[in-house]
Amino acid sequence: MSQKKQKIQVEQKVPENVAKKTQRDSKLRDAVAKRRTERLAANKTRRAQWEKTAQAYEAEYKAADKSLVDNLRKAKTEGGFYVPAEAKLILVVRIRGINTLNPQVRQTLRLLKLRQLHNAAFVRVNKATIEMIRKVEPYVTYGYPSRAVIKNLIYKRGYAKINGQRIPITNNNVIEQQLGKVGIHSVEDLIHEITTVGPHFKEANRFLWAFKLRGPRGGFIAKRRSFINQGDWGNREDLINDLVKRMI
């Protein structure tokens, strides 16, 4: 008599603690995946907004440039003169003062963020800052930065000052975390705020570490003479841009 082999299926019961862990792990994976999807979507939205804002700024800059050209042409046609608005922003570069300095001069240089040779910093034009610059004038050169130079400085030499640390501005998140509360979310927002000396210029400028430039290609002419006397220190007005381009 042949024996038939019967297959017996034995249901193994999963221990309760293992089942709960599996369920928790599954929920955790789902939550992580959901957060990642939401983060990617939010980043995509922010990038689109940054691009839109940059385009709006570019249109604003072009309109301002066109207005300036139109006003100059109109004045020339009418035989008059066009007087541009007074500058609201100065770029100051330290060119001297490695050795012992007068304590008052040293303190003023620090207030201007010019602690080291070839440091550069933006300064809002007002009575107080003009007086500060006059105190240290033989040690600095300054003038009115162009939009292109402001942009190059921030993109190529820009560092953030965060908790006393010099942090590279590698992406817009660094800016947004520190300045988002005042409406500055991207590097283009930062450039615009500095260029226009906007309502949150103080916060934007405080965020920036002093620019560390190199010695100018071709060197200086005569650092102990003023610019108006064929030297280097003092007010260069728009010609500050030529110098800084050689130092970036």
Curated annotation (Swiss-Prot):
This is Large ribosomal subunit protein uL30B. It comes from the Eukaryota. InterPro entries: Ribo_uL30_ferredoxin-like_sf, Ribosomal_uL30, Ribosomal_uL30_euk, Ribosomal_uL30_euk_arc, Ribosomal_uL30_ferredoxin-like, Ribosomal_uL30_N_euk. Belongs to the universal ribosomal protein uL30 family. Signal peptide: none annotated. Coiled coil: none annotated. One of its GO terms (molecular function) is RNA binding. Residues 1-45 are annotated as: Disordered. GO terms for biological process: maturation of LSU-rRNA from tricistronic rRNA transcript (SSU-rRNA, 5.8S rRNA, LSU-rRNA). GO terms for cellular component: cytosolic large ribosomal subunit. Binds to G-rich structures in 28S rRNA and in mRNAs. Plays a regulatory role in the translation apparatus; inhibits cell-free translation of mRNAs. Residues 8-41 have a biased composition (Basic and acidic residues). Keywords: Ribonucleoprotein, Ribosomal protein, RNA-binding.
